[in-house]
């Protein structure tokens, strides 16, 4: 598991990233937002980003959802 930090509304919050190689999925959790998602590890960069945007857009403004999804996508693909 990788723990990253995200700047959100003048706060630093923890983001937990886990890749299960055996079952081919990513688990991403941001407890301070009461949010988590499971993504198929077979998705490409664009698909990961789009899925994250859709998930985040349900409770974040569009610009915030885009910013957070972009950062999460970078972390997922670099780890």
Map each language-model feature to its residues.
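A general, composition-driven signal for non-globular sequence regions
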Residues: 1-3, 13, 36-39, 45, ...
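Negatively charged, low-complexity tracts enriched in Asp/Glu with abundant Ser/Thr
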Residues: 1-16, 50-59
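Mixed-charge, Lys/Arg-enriched low-complexity segments
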Residues: 43-79
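A short, structured beta-strand/loop element
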Residues: 20-45
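Alpha-helical structural elements
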Residues: 11-13, 21, 30, 70
